[in-house]
Amino acid sequence: MSAAIAEARAQGLVGERFDGYLAIVGDAGDQLRHQVQAINIRRRALYSDLADRRGASLEQVGMTAACQLLPTVHVGERYQASDKVWRTRSAGQELLVPDYCR
């Protein structure tokens, strides 16, 4: 992950989604949007390859990846659970992960 994306995550401008992709949270410049799009294109290509090899759907692979990506969200960073509500991770607060991650 680039330093710009890491900084944007720390500022709450970019967050991890429940489906394995990054998203812009609120207002962001074009450069940041392009970086998020590029990461999501790479993730989608990886998920597609894994889905083909495993005989799974793209969505299933993305959701499985989310189960690994969501725990990487640090305190102060944003994430979206399967209810599609954006949350900010707080110190001492349990991360709300989708049921399929348990």
Task: Please annotate each region the language model reported.
Residues M1-Q11, G15-E16, A23-V25, L58-R102:
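Amphipathic, charged alpha-helical segments and their helix-to-coil junctions
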